[in-house]
Amino acid sequence: MDDAALLARLVAELDHPNATRLGQALLALISSGELPPGQKLPPIRTVADQLGMSPAAVGQSWTLLRTRGIIETKTRGGTTVIGPPRSQRPQRFSQLNEVVEHTRVDLGRPLPDPRLLPDLGRALAEVGRRSHGLNLSDPPPITPQLREALAGHWPFETDDVVAVHRGIDGVEHALTALVAKGDAVAVEDPTVPRVLDILDRIGARVIPIGWLDDGPDLRELMRAFHSGAKLFVLQPNGHSPTGRSVSDAWLDEAAELVRRSEAHVIEFDNFPLLHPARKTLGVAVPEATVLIEGYSHSHGPDIQVAVMGGPREVIARVEQQIAYSHRWVSRVLQDALAVLLASDEASATVRAAANEYQRRHAQARGW
């Protein structure tokens, strides 16, 4: 397909072109093979003129496709198609699943006890009665009901929030938004295997930061920042696999390191409502903190919704990524989570579950 044919195709398919729709159209053509690897794309200004878009908007489409490894741009060689997105096997996660298949009791993953979960059926019934705006083709990134339910729950002032599919999906989106191939990333050690799989796929250089009694080693973190790391990934609450949480003193010192280094922090917390004290760097450095909260452990694994909050520019990039992939998170599940977060009965159930988990952990430590 030459430039003229490609531009004619885009003009015919895009009635109201914008950065998201243009990127989706190009991704479809690349995935189908109509734009094969090695083909040159027209200059950004040419595409902008033909579609009636600004060069900046076309550039946003190019940037996101380039971030996903679908196209590449060289200073003198223009922009070339690399090929459709490649699905890399998550090696560490696959190994964990293979071990679980031959294990009687799985202690490697913190799965919720179904007997301690709030009633999802009642929440879904309430959503069916009162939710508006379902079955829209272009819904907002987060439903008004869930945004309202989070207003009194989010642990610090943040620019914006967006719904994602579970916690690890949010982590992947945040890493993709902030990390490029070859970047150095400081990561707590140990950490969730999927995080390392995602960084492998991106092509990042991981700098492990070992956990001590009160949090990741701050001397190692300082050395990582000095060596060029501009991002730190950690679980401040209920760290998996150790179950530890950072101390208040650790938060104070770590926040000062983040300020001096001008780095970003990605925090993922799969147990935000199951710990009596929620620890986050976002209270001290909200401008640098991206927090992903998952609710499958407190409200059930069928609540396939997590929420990400952070700086406006990061959330905007994530919203673009979502628009290029699964488009949106189910509004039915978002509103069901909103109902549960606002319910006194569900909240009491979650508090009772938190107490029971703490009792079990204390008992296990005594073995």
Locate each region found by the language model.
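Short strand-turn motif at the edge of the Rossmann-like AdoMet-binding core
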Residues: 75, 237, 269-271, 295
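N-terminal basic, amphipathic alpha-helical segments
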Residues: 1-128, 323-330, 334, 338-341, ...
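Hydrophobic multi-pass inner-membrane translocation pores used for secretion
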Residues: 217, 244, 259, 264, ...
